[in-house]
């Protein structure tokens, strides 16, 4: 039996890089934790939507903001601000998100990380394969 497992985002198990950001993954038994790092100007609908093929994010995260500020902008017009220290749950209702201010937005994702990471890689690989087949 293992007494302890130590991991660190300095050496993540996986990384999903995209324009103006990245999503790092650390895998533990029965749990996947994600770390989102988004730079100034990052916006889901601009930087991730083209990879995903959907206009809005539909992942349902539970997490904590480590630094910076971002908004969650629901398709129905409701807007919420996430700031350092906030614990957040965002429903799977279609939503956009973007960084506010010049500081990088960094958050940890305790629920939804595995789905987001897998969803990103599937969409990225599909787009690359589609481009190869078209050429």
Q: What is each residue range found by the language model?
A:
Residues 1-37, 45, 123-126, 133:
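A short, N-terminal "cap"/entry segment at the start of jelly-roll beta-barrel domains
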Residues 35-56:
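Conserved short histidine dyad/triad with adjacent acidic residue
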Residues 51-76:
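Glycine- and acidic-residue-biased ligand/ion/polar-headgroup-sensing regions
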Residues 40-42, 111-126:
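Glyoxalase I/VOC metalloenzyme domain signal
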Residues 34, 78-80, 106:
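Short beta-strand segments
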